[in-house]
């Protein structure tokens, strides 16, 4: 085989190899840029996961199966915050443990999105609620209209933190 033919074959192989490698390098770079979003309660996991799709990673702050009403932060859960870009909170009393976790973490200034910001709230009722000093019912995710408002709040705020994907959110 003549040398010029070998060079042409080698160039063709190199171009093919680069064509195969470049997309994987780009996707690795995209994965490195994805937001890591912490959530405190399962409804917010569902909301956020559906908002971001494959554009971000959703990370529960507490392990599955824990009761958020009685949860006490563990060291490994607090440590998880250092790898997050933002945390989505209920913000009206259902996940008060998260404030203590964030304050004790290596990243106490991590941005926080309060899902219930500007969402009409229901007054807490019953002896247990009044005895616990609750003013509003924190189970806002049980209301369809409140859930819709929360999803819109979360999507809007994530769009501000991740403008490249704001249209997706």
Predicted regions and their residues:
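Extracytoplasmic metal-acquisition and chelation regions
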Residues: 27-168
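Bacterial N-terminal signal peptides that target proteins for export
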Residues: 2-14
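General N-terminal leader/first-domain-start detector
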Residues: 1-2, 25
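Bacterial N-terminal signal peptides
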Residues: 11-24
